Amino acid sequence: MDNFKKYLSTAPVLLTVWLSITASGIMIINRLYPDPLIFPI
C-alpha cells in the first residue's frame, strides 16, 4: 500500500489527474455556453 501511495504522488499521475479534471470542467462549461464570444458577464 505504501508503494501505491508513492506511485499516486508522482508528477505524471498528478498531471494526468489534473488535466482530466480541467478538461472535464471545460467540456461542461462549453456544453452550457457553446459560444464564449457571447458569454453573459
From Swiss-Prot:
Top-level taxon of the source organism: Eukaryota
UniProt GO cellular component terms: chloroplast thylakoid membrane; photosystem I
Function: May help in the organization of the PsaE and PsaF subunits.
Gene Ontology biological-process annotations: photosynthesis
Keywords, sorted A to Z: Chloroplast, Membrane, Photosynthesis, Photosystem I, Plastid, Thylakoid, Transmembrane, Transmembrane helix
Annotated protein name in UniProt: Photosystem I reaction center subunit IX
Localization of this protein: Plastid, Chloroplast thylakoid membrane
Homology family: Belongs to the PsaJ family.
UniProt cross-references to Pfam families, sorted A to Z: PSI_PsaJ
InterPro entries: PSI_PsaJ, PSI_PsaJ_sf
